Design a protein with these regions (language model features):
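Short alpha-helical segments that sit at the start of domains
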Residues: 1-21
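Short amphipathic alpha-helical elements of helix-turn-helix/winged-helix folds
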Residues: 20-28
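Residue-level detection of the helix-turn-helix DNA-binding "recognition helix"
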Residues: 26, 52-56
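Conserved short strand/loop->alpha-helix "switch" segment adjacent to the catalytic nucleotide/phosphoryl-transfer site
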Residues: 28, 34-39, 95-117
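Short amphipathic alpha-helical interaction segments
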Residues: 42-53, 110, 114
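A short, conserved structural fragment
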Residues: 55-65
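Conserved beta-strand-loop-beta-strand hairpin that lines the nucleotide-binding pocket
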Residues: 66-77, 121-149
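Helix-loop-beta hinge of the Bergerat
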Residues: 78-105
Length: 149
């Protein structure tokens, strides 16, 4: 007689495995399923089901068999000095970056506020550019802010 034992991981363990999967995808790690399964001591089919769930949730996309990439989203914000967009750094932060980090921990939001403020103040005070383009690129693991003048 064969018996099948089903093991359901705690939500924390599943989140840790998913996070590791995403980090390995970002690092372009070969043999993703095998690497993750060996690291966590789980069946590769469990890893495949987690990967498929990440694809369904559009957190990652399949490139080809065994190869995935993180799904990134981009937002562009044109700012104009003549329109008053560069009169203070809080306007640019509130309009361009804040909506994309509102669910982050408060300390992370504070760090972003400081860094973004330094970047935009440099443009406001030194470049005197009329037009500034801010691009926010975000995936499940990273957020990038680019300020071009």
């Amino acid at each position: 007689m064969r018996r099948c034992i089903s093991v359901k991981f705690s939500e924390d363990r599943k989140q840790n495995i998913n996070r590791y999967i995403l980090e390995k995808i970002q690092q372009n790690s070969p043999s993703l399923s095998r690497t993750v399964a060996e690291t966590f001591g789980v069946n590769p089919s469990t890893i495949h089901s987690y990967i498929n769930e990440l694809v369904r949730k559009q957190i990652i996309r399949k490139i080809k068999r065994g190869e995935y990439e993180l799904v990134s989203h981009k937002w562009d914000y044109p700012l104009q000095r003549s329109a008053g967009d560069l009169d203070n750094d809080t306007y640019a932060f509130d309009k361009c970056l804040s909506p994309h980090i509102k669910d982050f921990a408060n300390n992370i939001q504070d760090i972003w506020s400081y860094v973004f403020s330094e970047m935009i103040n440099n443009v406001m005070d030194h470049s005197m550019a009329e037009n500034v383009q801010i691009r926010i690129i975000q995936n499940f693991l990273t957020t990038t802010a680019i300020i071009a003048d």
